[in-house]
A protein has these predicted regions:
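Positively charged n-region of N-terminal signal peptides that target proteins for export
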Residues: 1-4
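Bacterial N-terminal signal peptides
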Residues: 7-17
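Extracellular/luminal low-complexity segments enriched in Ser/Thr/Pro
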Residues: 103-113
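Surface-exposed or secretory-pathway low-complexity segments enriched in glycine-proline
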Residues: 53-101
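Extracellular interdomain linkers/hinges and stalk-like, low-complexity segments
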Residues: 21-67, 125-139
Length: 139
């Protein structure tokens, strides 16, 4: 039986790295992520990407459970590089490979300055799951 190797790949942003940890189904809430972005600019919150041992993409569903009050979050498909992740470990033989995954992208309302907050979770076809609580400072 093939076992999925998974990684959560982050975009360029300020703040501590995302530690993917489940906070639903009775698991503890992960530490919040703190990011900063210019008003109206796109900010990649994460790049959930999962693959099998042959480096083929494994599906992943992303659900925004608490949308931001002053912006939008979109989930778009995109190529992501298989890199190590603190939770899921080494990418194995797929390290450095471009694999089709998703990107979770935040954009504030035009002209908004202040704080925003979003919660989302993802689940792969293989049952890997994580949740993120993101505090966003918009300047």
């Amino acid at each position: 039986m093939k076992r999925a190797i998974a990684a959560l790949l982050l975009g360029v942003a300020t703040g501590p790295p995302l530690v993917a940890d489940t906070a639903f189904a009775g698991h503890p809430v992960p530490d919040p992520i703190w990011l900063t972005v210019d008003s109206g600019a796109d900010l990649t919150l994460s790049r959930p990407t999962f693959w099998d041992r042959a480096c083929h993409p494994v599906g992943v569903a992303v659900t925004v459970t608490q949308p931001p009050a002053h912006g939008t979050v979109s989930v778009v498909a995109g190529l992501n590089t298989a890199n190590p992740n603190p939770r899921f470990g080494s990418p194995g033989p797929c390290g450095g490979t471009l694999i089709m995954g998703k990107r979770v992208v935040y954009r504030s309302e035009p002209g908004f300055n202040g704080n925003d907050y979003v919660v989302y979770h993802y689940v792969s076809d293989r049952g890997n799951r994580a949740e993120a609580h993101v505090n966003i400072t918009v300047r």
